[in-house]
Amino acid sequence: MKRIVRSLVVLLLLLAAALVGGSLYMLSYSLRPDATMRAKNASSYEYMYGEYPFLRPWVDSLERAGALRDTVITGNEGERLHALYAAAPRPTDRTAVIVHGYTDNAVRMLMIGYLYNHDLGYNILLPDLYYHGRSEGRAIRMGWKDRLDVLRWMDVANDIFGGDTRMVVHGISMGAATTMMVSGEEQRPYVKFF
């Protein structure tokens, strides 16, 4: 009987060790996917032009006109956070802040930016979340702390585009979750839609 109990205890300890080890590995893999993200960052424009050929002439025209610009803010922990932005083709107070998903970046959201900017005539701001794209950071934060950065990006967009905007905050995948977390915070008067 003692042998059976001892064997079960050893088996349970091995199972617990495997579960803890596997969990730590998966957590590290999901929050720090370095190789995956570097490859995505390096090929973002090529990927977007291949998947959405209509983007190339639009992005080229924005770049030729100097209308697709970079901006940065300093995060709460001192890290550099990056975003792309472009003014609408005609002056407007309508602005969209577009938040990307897990392991994506601002460039990979240009197809949504095209919809808002080219088709609907909105000003757009596309942030790279913490540890994504050209932003610094130590690990993916899965949206909870990112909500505070998005609130700051909303203020930046409002300032860049005239100070009295009517804003929509749009997210895809993890960006949608971040957007919903932002919606639970006290809102600025210029935010109209999520």
Q: Regions from the language model: what does each represent?
A:
Residues 4, 15-73:
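An N-terminal hydrophobic leader/cap segment in hydrolases
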Residues 76-87:
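A short loop-to-beta-strand scaffold at the N-terminal edge of the catalytic core in hydrolase folds
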Residues 102-116:
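The serine-hydrolase catalytic nucleophile loop
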Residues 156-160, 165-194:
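Primarily recognizes the serine-hydrolase "nucleophile elbow" in alpha/beta-hydrolase
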Residues 116-136:
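Conserved alpha/beta-hydrolase
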Residues 93-101:
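Short beta-strand element of the alpha/beta-hydrolase
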Residues 140-161:
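Alpha/beta-hydrolase active-site loop
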Residues 57, 106-108, 134:
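Short N-terminal helix/helix-N-cap motif within the alpha/beta-hydrolase-1
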